[in-house]
From Swiss-Prot:
Domain of life: Eukaryota
Species lineage: Eukaryota, Metazoa, Ecdysozoa, Arthropoda, Hexapoda
Function: Histones H1 are necessary for the condensation of nucleosome chains into higher-order structures.
Name of this protein: Histone H1-I
Family label: Belongs to the histone H1/H5 family.
Amino acid sequence: MSDSAPEIETPVEEAPKAATPAKSPAKSPGRAKKAKKDGSDKPKKPKAIPTHPPVSEMVVNALKTLNEKGGSSVIAIKKFLVATYKVEIEKLLPFIKKFLKGAVLKGEVLQVKGTGASGSFKMPPPAKKVDKPEAAPKKKAPRPKREIEKKEKKVVAKKPKPAVEKKAAKPAAKKAVAKPAAKKAAAKPAAKEPAAKASPKKAAAKPKAKPTPKKSTAAKPKAAAKKPAKKSK
């Protein structure tokens, strides 16, 4: 048989794709920190309470107690602190040197020898107390004469005011008194009328004293008689 068999198409199988891993949700930074904290939480040791005073106080006490003329070295200070306070001196040594440097700059400690934290140190002499002179009471400055004169003038000018008021009040009283006096004056003329009537009696009595003119009349005829005698010559 010459007829060929029909060709059967075979499906081409595709290679399976590699499975991509599923993405894990991104962790927030806050959660990550919490996770770290949860893992690092360990019981903390309580801070040891120091059984000694501050370094500065211990060093000052050492220098005052040793009180060496040439100053105390750092070694001498260390020995004193160990004997007195029973401290771990190697741990405190950096703090001791730091305090000494700062105290020298401030003038709280004198450095007799050496430089920096090496050498010998001592306390400065106590400062002498200077007695402050008591403040003298302030004297009041004398006032100038002009001011005193002005004040006196003011006082003198103020005093006459009540006197003027009194004087002004007196005329009012006089006027009140003068009114009844006028009434009395008006009443007096009535009393003088009888005196006026009595005056004619005195006038009538005056003619009684007229004998003097008679003498003068008697003397005149004698003179007349003498004149004719001259004619006879």
